[in-house]
Amino acid sequence: MLLFAVPMILGNIMQQCYNLADTWIVGRFVGAEALAAVGSAYTLMTFLNSILIGMCMGSGALFSICYGRRALRKLKEYIVSSFVLIFSVTVILTIVSYVCLDPILTLMQIPADIYGLMRSYMGLILAGLIFVFLYNYFAFLLRSSGNSVIPLIFLGVGTALNIGLDFFFVAKLGRGVKGAAEATVLAQAAAGLGIALYALVKEPELNMKKMKEEGIGIRADLLKEIFSYSASTGIQQSVMNFGILMVQGLVNSFGTSVMAAFAAGVKICLLYTSPSPRDISGS
């Protein structure tokens, strides 16, 4: 149990160190306006990410049951059906977020002086949702088999890459909030694609050729069961973050300076909480 839990705890510590470093880089090299914009965007992205993370968590519970029972055919069927389901939700969520971005920012009461900064940041950062899905889907799949080390390794690679790219894009190239967004998306891509490739190569249950030979495919009855698990955990994970998003909207009404202070305060408060390690979610 300890060997399984320690990598997850280390991943959480790693994520919080990244959050503080990233906040410092944006605030130090770009300014209070950028920190306010990125801080509000972080709250919105955390809400969107939590929906996908919760759905991946629900699928992970089903994977664990199959591993425990050694029901390998059922496991493969769950993997195929759940991947298609959550991938589809990710694509829909990304498109809807892009289309409704202006109304969302209006509802969040983003001040006019940073509206352009936040819209520019969000326009780039939403592209990373697909990589958030990939990382968390395969991380929960690996953890369901008892492997919590590999997800930690790829989280560490993504975190280190994110901090390094932040310094390069923001501090050296002076790309501002666009640079911060680009750094985050590239780090998410590295972590998400990396863990996906690892799982596809190393996990025998994910052998595509064998799945095809065994006639493994999408099953409508399993989609309903998976959706039941995934939707409930997705809602559970996102409810608290939706509340924080509402608080962020109230904070935004007080102006840029208060928003910047709130953004820094939230990152510090995260050090005193213990969420499970999730992803490189944003600046």
What are these regions (language model features)?
Residues M1-A5, F63-G128, K172-S230, P275-R278, ...:
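Short alpha-helical transmembrane segments in multi-pass integral membrane proteins
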Residues M1-G60, S64, S228-V251:
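Signature of the first transmembrane helix
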Residues C17-A36, L105-A112, F168-R175, S238-L271:
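Helix-terminus/linker motif at the lipid-water interface of multi-pass membrane proteins
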Residues L35-I95, V132-P151, A261-R278, S283:
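Small-residue-rich hydrophobic transmembrane alpha-helices
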Residues T43, T159-A160, V185-G192, K267:
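Residue-level recognition of pore/gate-forming positions within transmembrane alpha-helices
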Residues F47, N162-I163, G192-A196, L271:
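Hydrophobic transmembrane alpha-helices of multi-pass small-molecule transporters
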Residues I86, L141-G164, K178-V185:
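Alpha-helical transmembrane segments of multi-pass membrane transporters/permeases
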